[in-house]
């Protein structure tokens, strides 16, 4: 059908011509019906009567067949006319759709919406809307959690660094916004009023009210350990080995529990005699 080319006007003209032919054939058959279906015997003998009956039967049978052929012809002409009209309507619809391609889609969408308007009750429609809203919120929450866990190794280091820099830039913008809000709260007039009116004290520039002599208040306190008069205790005498930490040779006691302890085990190795 993709290679079929149809001209509706030509189909209509062909149907009209075939209709004319069928009407002419029907008229001829009707004219021949009387002399061919009622034949009189040539004589009064039996043979003439049998011949007349045989010719009458053939004439009657021809009229029956021609009537059936006329019915089939009329049906064909009718079908051809309907097909021509259908092709014409389809061609006009295709032309209008090609001129505005979205009109057909819009019409189909409107038909679908109208068909499904009363399909779901209002309570189910609200439930479906809530499900869609909750699903969208869950997706957003999952995305936020993934971004928050990026520092735990879920993302490569480069992507994590880019995310951190982006967050840092947003924080800096937030601080600038806070400073701007503070300036707006203080007002421009209050800030400009105090400019250039402070007096200098040393290397500082302070308001005039601060230029007076300040009273210094200080108290002395005794440092801990300042009253110690006893001599520092002397370490116990012991035997030390060069290269080892100094530890007493006394027996073990509970004071050294938990501290590292070192032991020395002498190793005696024979030396080869040399001559």
Curated annotation (Swiss-Prot):
Keyword flag Disulfide bond: no
UniProt keyword annotation of Secreted present: yes
InterPro entries: PE-PGRS_N (IPR000084), PPE_C (IPR022171)
Keywords from the UniProt entry: Cell wall, Secreted, Virulence
Gene Ontology, cellular component aspect: extracellular region
Location in or out of the cell: Secreted, Cell wall
UniProt xrefs under Pfam families: PE, PPE-SVP
Record-annotated PE domain positions: 5-93
Complexes and interactors: Forms a heterodimer with PPE15. The dimer forms a 1:1:1 heterotrimeric complex with EspG5.
Functional summary from the UniProt entry: Promotes the intracellular survival of recombinant Mycobacterium within macrophages by regulating host inflammatory cytokines production and inhibiting cell late apoptosis.
Family designation: Belongs to the mycobacterial PE family.
Protein name, as recorded: PE family protein PE8
Species, as recorded: Mycobacterium tuberculosis (strain ATCC 25618 / H37Rv)
């Amino acid at each position: 059908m993709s290679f079929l080319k149809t001209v509706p006007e030509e189909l209509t003209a062909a149907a009209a011509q075939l209709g004319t032919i069928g009407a002419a054939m029907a008229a001829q058959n009707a004219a021949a019906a009387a002399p061919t279906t009622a034949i009189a015997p040539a004589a009064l003998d039996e043979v003439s009567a049998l011949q007349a009956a045989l010719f009458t039967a053939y004439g009657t049978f021809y009229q029956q067949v021609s009537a059936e052929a006329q019915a089939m012809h009329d049906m064909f002409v009718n079908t051809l006319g309907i097909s021509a009209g259908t092709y014409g309507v389809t061609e006009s619809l295709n032309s209008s759709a090609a001129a505005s391609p979205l009109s057909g889609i819009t019409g189909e969408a409107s038909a679908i919406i109208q068909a499904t308007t009363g399909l779901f009750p209002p309570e189910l429609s609200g439930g479906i809307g809530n499900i869609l809203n909750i699903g969208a919120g869950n997706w957003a929450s999952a995305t936020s959690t993934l971004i928050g866990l990026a520092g735990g190794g879920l993302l490569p280091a480069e992507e994590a660094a880019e995310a951190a820099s982006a967050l840092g830039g947003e924080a800096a913008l937030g601080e600038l916004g806070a400073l701007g809000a503070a300036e707006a709260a203080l007002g421009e007039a209050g800030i400009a009023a105090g400019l250039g009116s402070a007096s200098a004290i040393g290397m500082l520039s302070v308001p005039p009210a601060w230029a007076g002599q300040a009273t210094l208040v200080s108290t002395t306190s005794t440092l801990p350990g300042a009253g110690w008069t006893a001599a520092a205790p002397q370490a116990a005498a012991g035997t030390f080995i060069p290269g080892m930490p100094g530890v007493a040779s006394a027996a073990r006691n509970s004071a050294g529990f938990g501290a590292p302890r070192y032991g020395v085990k002498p190793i005696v190795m024979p030396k080869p005699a040399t001559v």
